[in-house]
Amino acid sequence: MNAFKIILQSVNDVKDFVNTVSKFNYDIDLVSGRYVVDAKSIMGIFSLDLTKPIEVRVFADKFDNLLSELKRFII
């Protein structure tokens, strides 16, 4: 597992994030406090506190393409 932090500041950011991570076949979770949701679930993401940074957990060894596509969200 690999992890990094992101920030999603608008509804469009959430939509773009979900569309991007949905292209990848490996599991990706989002963690906010004690809550863990599937990063490919738009409804799950909206259940999180989006005013704070969110931890992304990627369950893959090689995910450089994902990082390059998400670089605008990474903090």
Where do the protein language model's features map onto the residues?
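Short glycine-/aliphatic-rich beta-strand segments at the starts of folded cytosolic domains
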Residues: M1-L8
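Conserved beta-strand core positions
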Residues: F4, Y26-I28, I54
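Glycine- and other small-residue-rich loops at beta-strand/loop junctions that grip anionic moieties
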Residues: I6, R34, F59
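Electropositive phosphate-/nucleotide-binding environments in soluble metabolic enzymes
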Residues: L8-V11, A39, A60, D64
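Amphipathic alpha-helical interaction surfaces in cytosolic regulatory modules
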Residues: V11-D27, Y35-L50
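Conserved short beta-strand edge segments in small beta-sheet-based binding/regulatory domains
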Residues: D29-G33, R72-I75
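C-terminal structural segments of small proteins and small subunits
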Residues: S47-I75
